[in-house]
Amino acid sequence: MMLTSAILLLTLGVQLSHADDSSRENFSNRCDQLAKEIHIPNVTVNFVEYVANGTNVTLADNPPSCGQSNQVVLADLCRVAMEVTTSNQSQITLEAWFPENYTGRFLSTGNGGLAGCIQYVDMAYASSMGFATVGANGGHNGTSGESFYHNPDIVEDLSWRSVHTGVVVGKELTKKFYHEGFHKSYYLGCSTGGRQGFKAVQEFVHDFDGVVAGCPAFNFVNLNSWSGHFYPITGNSSADTFLTTAQWTLVQQSVMEQCDSLDGAVDGVIEAIDQCHPVFEQLICRPGQNASECLTGKQVNTAQLVLSPIYGTKGEFLYPRMQPGVENVDMYITYNGDPFAYSTDWYKYVVFSDPNWDPATLNAQDYEIALAQNPSNIQTFEGDLSAFRDAGAKVLTYHGTADPIITGETSKVYYRHVAETMNAAPEELDEFYRYFRIGGMSHCGGGTGATAIGNVLSAQWSNDPDANVLMAMVRWVEEGVAPEYIRGASLGSGPGAKVEYTRRHCKYPTRNVYVGPGNWTDENAWKCIL
């Protein structure tokens, strides 16, 4: 009997293997056939290829500044690479990844920085989850803004046209490749990708049923002014207003001493970011004190100024403060005595069309000149989202309280802008727009604390909708169950990192407070309060 059972199991295994091989061959043949069926205006197909799960794809055409030469594919899929003409002087590079384990869902990824790079990691992540996935390069190659010089069409691609065109083409290809087409459409992006998601929310309300937009770069023109204004404040490394990394470390330590406990727990995470308003006069050098262990009065002023909003020439508010507590990161990014590259490129190649423009001269009058231009409405700061709401679509946005690139304060400012414009209280906005503050999260991920929320591949520790923002959006759209919180995890380092602890991140306008009685690593010891 045992021998008979073993033979049956072996036979079944061989049959299943043959079935898998046959299914894979059929899928590969469908991929080959697709190459002959693509006839879309303005679309030039570079190649169509079947890629097996686990293949490490070489990205030979990816610009070096994008920092990615290869990507491991996480599903058997059909890869389509294209160029799409968007005007007589612009085009986008577009890819579509169609997985064999298709769930009937379409998804577009976004970009980062000044765009110019397809987010292949996000494409691998989404396609592994069964989404037909598209990604574009924002209308130019690489991270520099030099392509914008005297070419407003490329700026328009960056503003909205790259993502929207990718969606239009991608949906048509999805319907062509899969007989059933798609039943729901989603978006997943962060930073510039977050802004691109909100551009769809504000202007292309039928592109997506659900948008996940992280750390959004909306209020884009003022964001570039704000990012650029740190250099005139700190000066270069020889200026008497400049702080060394040792001195910024002192400032950051002082912030944590003053603010970490405001949420009830000393855990290296400032949850009570709205209540954090540090002072630094106590750091001024005393007679005989080592200069690396203290600050001059001018340096204290620098530390206060970088934590202040920016205003126009008439005192009008333009962009909020950098949230305190990120000095130990920003001392390498925007407080390092060098101009911030993205802001410099925006002003050189778009605002002033002058490659010789000096970023040290940036001032409030320049902010106003830039804002008045707002090419292709790249600001992405419309407050009336009623058309998106009425279309039945949903948007979930998240932002870290320790973001050193795009201050988390800007998502709070935008939420209030929408509430005031639409005359809508939080419970009304909750029907279609939910914002979560992620304690300790850096820019789009990482940082200190339970920051892994499934927004990117490296932060995927669970596919439970309570612990994965993408699947939370799927559940909201398809089952009508809206997320009340997002569970994040603190992950150990290295391959196969395990969960150290979890925390439920609160829906704005509530905030996380430690109430005990357990350890601060116990998610049940925290409560969301107003």
From Swiss-Prot:
Q: Which InterPro entries match?
A: AB_hydrolase_fold (IPR029058), Tannase/feruloyl_esterase (IPR011118)
What is the annotated localization of this protein? Answer: Secreted
- For Ca(2+), which residues are the binding ones? D260, D263, A265, D267, V269
The catalytic residues are S191 (acyl-ester intermediate), D403 (charge relay system), H443 (charge relay system)
Check the UniProt entry and state the signal peptide residues, or none: 1-25
Q: Indicate the segments annotated as coiled coil, or none if absent.
A: none
Q: Which reaction does it catalyse?
A: feruloyl-polysaccharide + H2O = ferulate + polysaccharide
State the GO CC annotations: extracellular region
The record's GO molecular-function terms, alphabetically, read: feruloyl esterase activity; metal ion binding
Annotated disulfide bonds: C31-C78, C66-C117, C190-C444, C259-C276, C285-C294, C506-C528
One GO BP: xylan catabolic process
Q: What is its EC number?
A: 3.1.1.73
Q: Name one Pfam family in it.
A: Tannase
Keywords, ordered alphabetically = Calcium, Carbohydrate metabolism, Disulfide bond, Hydrolase, Metal-binding, Polysaccharide degradation, Secreted, Serine esterase, Signal, Xylan degradation
Function, as annotated: Involved in degradation of plant cell walls. Hydrolyzes the feruloyl-arabinose ester bond in arabinoxylans as well as the feruloyl-galactose and feruloyl-arabinose ester bonds in pectin. Active against methyl esters of sinapate (MSA) and caffeate (MCA).
* Matches recorded under PANTHER family: FERULOYL ESTERASE B-RELATED (PTHR33938:SF15)
Q: What's the protein called, per UniProt?
A: Feruloyl esterase C
Source species = Talaromyces stipitatus (strain ATCC 10500 / CBS 375.48 / QM 6759 / NRRL 1006) (Penicillium stipitatum)
